[in-house]
Curated annotation (Swiss-Prot):
Cellular component terms (Gene Ontology): egg chorion; extracellular region
Domain of life from the UniProt record: Eukaryota
GO biological process: one example: chorion-containing eggshell formation
Organism: Drosophila melanogaster
Keyword terms of this UniProt record: Secreted, Signal
Protein name: Chorion protein S18
Length: 172
């Protein structure tokens, strides 16, 4: 059983080391097998790099022929290693300029300080003044002219109703 696993591992590594097909770059034109041997870091950035072949229509503007997405390790930005050295002219291990921007943003995001705990909304205490009803339980005394009698209450109600209907007393 152990020999069978070793044979399978060797076969898989041999196939992945070989580019899938043509001599000018294989499947999609990118050296895919080279990534099988590398130990990838914890963070990789997908970069759009020229593939020089593959896709529909090759390099002549066909579908998928000119560019391909390839993982580029971010550790080259920290260690100064020359991973991806076929792309010269940038300060991040020779990555293409678009990828150099992505790596710089990733470095900023990883180096940014933590925001900490969420802010607690603090309000000033509210001092409400309670309004108490009057404490006197004695019946309120009305004046002599304010006392309403039964007959005058009916007359007052009828005069209010007449005022609403449009009847007015003649004024002199």
């Amino acid at each position: 059983m152990m020999k069978f696993m070793c044979i399978c591992l060797c076969a898989i590594s041999a196939v992945s080391a070989n580019s899938y097909g043509r001599s000018r770059g294989g499947y999609g034109g990118a050296p895919v097998g080279g990534y099988a041997y590398q130990v990838q870091p914890a963070l990789t950035v997908k970069a759009i790099v020229p593939s020089y072949g593959g896709g529909y229509g090759g390099n002549h503007g066909g579908y998928g022929g000119a560019y391909e997405s390839v993982p580029v390790p971010v550790s080259s930005a920290y260690s100064g290693a020359n991973v991806g050295s076929q792309y010269s002219g940038s300060g991040y291990g020779g990555a293409p300029p678009v990828d150099a921007q992505a790596i710089a943003l990733a470095k900023l995001a990883l180096a940014a300080p933590s925001a900490g705990a969420p802010l607690v909304w603090k309000e000033a205490p509210r001092y409400a003044q309670p309004v108490y009803p009057p404490t006197s339980y004695v019946n309120q005394e009305y004046g002599h002219s304010e006392k309403v009698k039964g007959g005058s209450a009916a007359a007052a109600a009828s005069s209010v109703a007449a005022g609403k209907k449009g009847y007015k007393r003649p004024s002199y």
